[in-house]
């Protein structure tokens, strides 16, 4: 709820990107290696989204290309990028042989007819198929703080932390003529401070989620009854869904109860 997805999508508008210059992918557990790199669908050998954009960017070195991955922590980036992950921070250079790699399907492509081999390869060298990631292809991801990616993936990126914007939250509530907007924001701050300082396992809440409090107003104010309803219907389900599988139900329930006690005027 900190606006990560909105910021990612806004890049398309800000850069005035043509459809051919970007791919926007929202990950889920069903994504596989063949969806990003390549593989067989039935009897057809198909390029994945990332490989296809690598080829387009390589053939247009003066253009800018963007691969936008939303909800990156929903799937294993190591599995879906495969060998290509090592090239995220070693982009293609004609003088650098290590900027080319053989993927798990390169030997399959080598056996194709010449025309099909060229079509299925990012690059051909000495008649063999190679993968490369061009320098004019930018990869941007969003992921939740409580989820992790492997160090091998993490080191390829510059990380930008997105936090709850309490100013934006207060402006949003005031625009909806909620007269106790400042007091409501103070409660939200207290909850996130409690989560950061006192508990393990609960995730911090972003302003995008807290903006939902506007639906719980009564007579131009948000009363304690509204806070209670918001906590039960919005926050508690988020806490439970975001909790790791190692959490014991009892201890999680205790932490949620403690958080609820903080979410008060």
Q: Each PLM stretch: what is its role?
A:
Residues 1-265:
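C-terminal regulatory/interaction module of P-loop NTP-utilizing enzymes
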């Amino acid at each position: 709820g900190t606006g990560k997805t909105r910021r990612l999508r806004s890049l398309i508008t800000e850069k005035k990107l043509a459809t051919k210059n970007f791919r926007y992918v929202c990950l889920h557990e069903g994504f596989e290696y063949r969806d990003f790199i390549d593989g067989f669908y039935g009897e057809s050998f198909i390029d994945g989204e990332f490989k296809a954009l690598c080829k387009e960017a390589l053939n247009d070195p003066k253009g800018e290309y963007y691969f936008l991955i939303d909800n990156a922590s929903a799937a294993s980036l190591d599995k879906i990028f495969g060998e290509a992950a090592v090239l995220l921070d070693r982009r293609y250079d004609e003088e650098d042989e290590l900027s080319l790699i053989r993927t798990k399907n390169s030997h399959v492509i080598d056996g194709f007819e010449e025309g099909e081999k060229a079509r299925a390869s990012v690059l051909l060298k000495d008649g063999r198929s190679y993968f490369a990631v061009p320098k004019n292809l930018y990869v941007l991801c969003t992921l939740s703080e409580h989820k992790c990616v492997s160090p091998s993936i993490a080191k390829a990126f510059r990380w930008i932390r997105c936090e709850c914007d309490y100013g934006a939250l207060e402006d949003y509530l005031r625009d909806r003529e909620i007269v106790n907007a400042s007091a409501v924001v103070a409660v939200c701050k207290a909850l996130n401070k409690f989560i950061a300082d006192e508990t393990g396992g609960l995730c911090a809440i972003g302003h995008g989620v807290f903006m939902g409090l506007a639906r719980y107003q009564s007579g131009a104010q948000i009363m304690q009854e509204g806070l209670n309803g918001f906590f039960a219907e919005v926050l508690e389900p988020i806490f439970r869904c975001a909790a790791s599988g190692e959490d014991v139900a009892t201890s999680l329930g205790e932490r949620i109860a403690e958080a609820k006690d903080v979410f008060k005027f």
